[in-house]
Amino acid sequence: MANTKVADVVTETLHVAGVKRIYGVVGDSLNGITDSLRRRGDIDWIHVRHEESAAFAAGAEAHLTGELAVCAGSCGPGNLHLINGLFDCHRSRVPVLAIAAHIPSAEIGRGYFQETHPESLFRECSHYCELVSSPEQLPGVLESAIRAAVGLRGVAVVIIPGDVALRESNAKPAAGASMALRPPVVQPAAADVDALAQLLNDSGKVTLLCGRGCAGAHDPLVKLAEALKAPIVHAFGGKEYVEYDNPYDVGMTGLIGFSSGYHAMLNCDTLLMLGTDFPYRQFYPADAKIAQVDVRPENLGRRARLDLGMVGDVSATIGALLPKLKARTDRAYLDACLAHYRKAREGLDELPPASRDASPFTHNTWPSWSARQRRTMRFSRSTWARRRSGPRVISP
């Protein structure tokens, strides 16, 4: 790629990585990037009215596709506006790359117009955050950022001064295969699976608490609940992955949850936490044994005292666990929890609109409508333009 610019290396690398669009607001420090996109024509620039929206849009794309999404902001307040959306992306563990343009490199550290220190500001909401100071540095930093975002599931930030983006570069992007990472599957240790099976086989009433980490594990979860005759409670982050087509689900718990979810956790002998960092300590049972499975070791025991903690992918863990469980026939506890759930839902199922295209804003059923819309993906501009209290009416 002789006689090309650093910005061209950026856009070519993103193209090789499979990026189809970049969300952002144009600015002079981003001119190199946007001009390169214009000349290429194979990556769309999605212009938004505020950089915060760009970060949230990239997060939504990454969440729905599971693939890398990209947003960009110009120097100073431009990229600072990304931060709220990037925190959401990072906490939701979706792969997002943020390109933060910076002031001219010769002016860094001299109190220049709109100068900030983005390498410090974005550190808390990213797995990777680095400043590019030279054309030679760019390829390695950008490739590392992409691998961090995809492999670690979260945000990576690359900071590029506007003048650096316009410099010439002879660098070549990495081959696509080296960046096309798939999320790793963490297999639990065999000894941990044996210990968990022993704990569950020796337990009476078991409840499953499921979170965002149960993505892709719906069918194994249902099989586990059937084997244990256990009710499934879901945290808000697990709602879309757990609740649908699930005869064992007894509702969401938490500050906006059902009493049935709280009841199922409070009255169990053993609580099995699967892929959740459910934050509300007051909702955990005081006397039950608690086991936790999570791919992130730092989550283990962070919210409640554990009798057993293990690192593993939820689906892989259930697959290894099921053959070791004793078959159960007693449904008394499960049926009691399901009855409580039906009682808690009385009157609610009649509230959602009969039509998928009906507005939710005249009904007090926003969570139900929102969950259904996410599954059907039937969004429209007019739908999202309305406020929760109803459509905005402008008097003549």
From Swiss-Prot:
Pfam families given in the database record: TPP_enzyme_M, TPP_enzyme_N
Secretion signal span: none
Domain of life of the organism encoding this protein: Bacteria
InterPro entries, alphabetized: DHS-like_NAD/FAD-binding_dom, POXB-like, THDP-binding, Thiamin_PyroP_enz_cen_dom, Thiamin_PyroP_enz_TPP-bd_dom, TPP_PYR_POXB-like
UniProt-listed Gene3D superfamilies: 3.40.50.970, TPP-binding domain (3.40.50.1220)
One MF term in the entry's GO annotations: thiamine pyrophosphate binding
Protein name: Uncharacterized 42.6 kDa protein in isoamylase 3'region
